[in-house]
Amino acid sequence: DSVRDNGEDYILTRQAIVDYIELYLRTPADFHDSRFAPLIATSLADLPRTLVITAEYDPLRDEGEAFAARLDAEGNEVACFRMNDGVHGYFLYPSVLSLVRDTYRLIAHFLDGDPLPKPGDRPWLTLLGTD
């Protein structure tokens, strides 16, 4: 569980997540609104081509990857990449410039309309040429 494993000492903490949720919610009923939590939507079918990028040490990693898996299961065109050694918001930190550069290259491939990898492919190596 990424919240348990990465919810302390990696910039975004478990408590900060709770605090942000409380700031975002208008009423407790929002917890049951798929606009607040897309994973609870009855259907995620027929959504646009989607790129999901998660970070290895992000407490929200599992949620992002579950969203990508659900999009895939419902027939959407989706690719999901976990950025090794990344923390929540890593692309804002110049100390991880090579990781940021790779992330932007991945986004550029997606925006250019390059084909998304199929399950079982090695998309990191294919798209970024880092073999």
Kindly give the residue locations of the regions a language model identified:
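Alpha/beta-hydrolase superfamily serine-hydrolase fold, recognizing
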Residues: 1-131
